[in-house]
Protein backbone atom coordinates (compact mmCIF):
# COMPACT_ATOMS: atom_id res chain seq x y z
CA UNK A 1 0.00 0.00 0.00
CA UNK A 2 1.50 3.36 -0.99
CA UNK A 3 1.93 6.02 1.66
CA UNK A 4 1.92 9.73 0.87
CA UNK A 5 3.97 12.36 2.62
CA UNK A 6 2.50 15.80 1.96
CA UNK A 7 -0.33 16.48 -0.45
CA UNK A 8 -1.04 14.39 -3.51
CA UNK A 9 -0.77 16.33 -6.75
CA UNK A 10 -4.09 16.97 -8.52
CA UNK A 11 -5.65 19.11 -11.26
CA UNK A 12 -4.96 22.26 -9.23
CA UNK A 13 -1.26 21.50 -9.27
CA UNK A 14 1.33 22.11 -11.97
CA UNK A 15 4.33 19.82 -11.80
CA UNK A 16 7.72 21.46 -12.15
CA UNK A 17 9.08 21.10 -15.69
CA UNK A 18 12.36 22.38 -17.06
CA UNK A 19 10.79 23.83 -20.19
CA UNK A 20 7.69 25.33 -18.58
CA UNK A 21 7.85 28.46 -16.51
CA UNK A 22 5.00 29.97 -14.57
CA UNK A 23 2.75 32.63 -16.08
CA UNK A 24 0.41 35.01 -14.32
CA UNK A 25 -2.50 32.96 -15.71
CA UNK A 26 -1.33 30.15 -13.39
CA UNK A 27 -1.97 32.37 -10.35
CA UNK A 28 -5.66 31.81 -9.66
CA UNK A 29 -5.82 32.29 -5.90
CA UNK A 30 -7.49 35.21 -4.20
CA UNK A 31 -4.94 37.97 -3.64
CA UNK A 32 -4.35 39.08 -0.06
CA UNK A 33 -3.78 42.86 -0.06
CA UNK A 34 -2.86 42.71 3.65
CA UNK A 35 -0.09 40.14 3.17
CA UNK A 36 2.58 42.76 2.58
CA UNK A 37 3.73 40.95 -0.57
CA UNK A 38 3.36 41.55 -4.29
CA UNK A 39 2.61 37.87 -4.88
CA UNK A 40 2.59 34.47 -3.22
CA UNK A 41 3.67 31.16 -4.72
CA UNK A 42 2.49 27.94 -3.06
CA UNK A 43 4.77 25.01 -3.81
CA UNK A 44 4.57 21.43 -2.61
CA UNK A 45 7.06 18.62 -2.33
CA UNK A 46 5.61 15.15 -1.82
CA UNK A 47 6.75 11.56 -1.94
CA UNK A 48 4.69 8.40 -2.33
CA UNK A 49 6.51 5.27 -1.29
CA UNK A 50 6.09 1.55 -0.73
CA UNK A 51 8.24 -1.42 0.17
CA UNK A 52 7.56 -4.48 -1.96
CA UNK A 53 9.57 -7.64 -2.59
CA UNK A 54 12.44 -6.27 -0.54
CA UNK A 55 12.69 -3.08 -2.60
CA UNK A 56 11.73 0.48 -1.87
CA UNK A 57 9.64 2.21 -4.51
CA UNK A 58 8.88 5.91 -4.48
CA UNK A 59 7.50 8.75 -6.59
CA UNK A 60 8.53 12.32 -5.83
CA UNK A 61 6.40 15.27 -6.93
CA UNK A 62 7.30 18.96 -6.96
CA UNK A 63 4.27 21.09 -7.76
CA UNK A 64 2.73 24.56 -7.76
CA UNK A 65 -0.83 25.20 -6.56
CA UNK A 66 -2.87 27.44 -8.84
CA UNK A 67 -5.60 28.06 -6.28
CA UNK A 68 -3.25 28.94 -3.41
CA UNK A 69 -0.97 31.21 -5.46
CA UNK A 70 -1.82 34.82 -6.22
CA UNK A 71 -0.38 38.07 -7.50
CA UNK A 72 -1.16 41.71 -6.74
CA UNK A 73 1.69 43.24 -8.74
CA UNK A 74 1.82 41.32 -12.01
CA UNK A 75 4.94 42.08 -14.01
CA UNK A 76 7.76 39.99 -15.45
CA UNK A 77 10.20 40.98 -12.70
CA UNK A 78 7.91 39.81 -9.88
CA UNK A 79 7.03 36.67 -11.84
CA UNK A 80 10.74 35.89 -12.17
CA UNK A 81 11.10 36.14 -8.37
CA UNK A 82 8.11 33.85 -7.89
CA UNK A 83 9.53 31.35 -10.41
CA UNK A 84 12.60 31.34 -8.17
CA UNK A 85 10.46 29.96 -5.34
CA UNK A 86 9.20 27.15 -7.58
CA UNK A 87 12.74 26.42 -8.75
CA UNK A 88 13.96 26.24 -5.13
CA UNK A 89 11.28 23.61 -4.47
CA UNK A 90 12.62 21.65 -7.47
CA UNK A 91 16.16 21.84 -6.07
CA UNK A 92 14.92 20.11 -2.94
CA UNK A 93 12.95 17.52 -4.92
CA UNK A 94 16.24 16.61 -6.58
CA UNK A 95 18.07 16.59 -3.25
CA UNK A 96 15.39 14.29 -1.87
CA UNK A 97 15.79 11.95 -4.83
CA UNK A 98 19.57 11.98 -4.39
CA UNK A 99 19.23 11.04 -0.70
CA UNK A 100 16.70 8.30 -1.42
CA UNK A 101 18.90 6.80 -4.13
CA UNK A 102 21.90 6.71 -1.79
CA UNK A 103 20.18 5.52 1.36
CA UNK A 104 20.18 1.83 2.31
CA UNK A 105 16.66 1.10 3.50
CA UNK A 106 15.58 -1.89 5.50
CA UNK A 107 12.10 -3.25 5.99
CA UNK A 108 12.12 -2.63 9.73
CA UNK A 109 13.05 1.07 9.69
CA UNK A 110 12.29 2.42 6.23
CA UNK A 111 9.12 4.34 7.19
CA UNK A 112 10.84 6.13 10.07
CA UNK A 113 13.95 6.73 7.99
CA UNK A 114 12.00 8.09 5.02
CA UNK A 115 9.93 10.39 7.22
CA UNK A 116 13.11 11.77 8.81
CA UNK A 117 14.77 12.32 5.43
CA UNK A 118 11.62 14.00 4.07
CA UNK A 119 11.23 16.24 7.12
CA UNK A 120 14.90 17.26 7.00
CA UNK A 121 14.67 18.11 3.29
CA UNK A 122 11.44 20.10 3.69
CA UNK A 123 12.90 22.04 6.65
CA UNK A 124 15.96 22.89 4.52
CA UNK A 125 13.66 23.91 1.65
CA UNK A 126 11.64 26.26 3.85
CA UNK A 127 14.83 27.77 5.29
CA UNK A 128 16.15 28.45 1.78
CA UNK A 129 12.79 29.92 0.67
CA UNK A 130 12.84 32.27 3.65
CA UNK A 131 16.50 33.22 3.09
CA UNK A 132 15.70 33.94 -0.60
CA UNK A 133 12.97 36.39 0.39
CA UNK A 134 15.00 37.89 3.23
CA UNK A 135 18.20 38.43 1.23
CA UNK A 136 16.42 39.81 -1.84
CA UNK A 137 13.97 41.77 0.33
CA UNK A 138 11.18 40.01 -1.59
CA UNK A 139 12.87 40.96 -4.92
CA UNK A 140 13.23 44.67 -4.07
CA UNK A 141 17.04 44.35 -3.97
CA UNK A 142 17.65 43.88 -7.69
CA UNK A 143 21.35 43.03 -7.32
CA UNK A 144 20.68 40.32 -4.73
CA UNK A 145 17.72 39.09 -6.80
CA UNK A 146 19.93 38.63 -9.86
CA UNK A 147 22.52 36.82 -7.74
CA UNK A 148 19.93 34.46 -6.30
CA UNK A 149 18.47 33.61 -9.71
CA UNK A 150 21.97 32.73 -10.91
CA UNK A 151 22.61 30.64 -7.78
CA UNK A 152 19.31 28.77 -8.31
CA UNK A 153 20.16 28.14 -11.98
CA UNK A 154 23.60 26.77 -11.05
CA UNK A 155 22.21 24.49 -8.36
CA UNK A 156 19.54 23.10 -10.70
CA UNK A 157 22.30 22.37 -13.22
CA UNK A 158 24.49 20.70 -10.56
CA UNK A 159 21.58 18.45 -9.58
CA UNK A 160 20.53 17.71 -13.17
CA UNK A 161 21.46 14.02 -12.76
CA UNK A 162 18.68 13.78 -10.15
CA UNK A 163 15.97 15.46 -12.26
CA UNK A 164 14.52 12.14 -13.40
CA UNK A 165 12.73 11.32 -10.21
Where are these regions (language model features)?
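Bacterial Sec-dependent N-terminal signal peptides
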Residues: 1-11
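Metalloprotease/metallohydrolase-associated module, dominated by Zn2+-dependent proteases
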Residues: 10-54, 60, 64, 105-165
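A mature extracytoplasmic/lumenal domain signature
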Residues: 64-66, 90-92
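C-terminal soluble interaction/assembly domains
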Residues: 71-72
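Active-site recognition of the HExxH zinc-binding catalytic motif
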Residues: 77-89
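Sec-exported extracytoplasmic/periplasmic mature domains
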Residues: 88, 94-101, 105, 126, ...
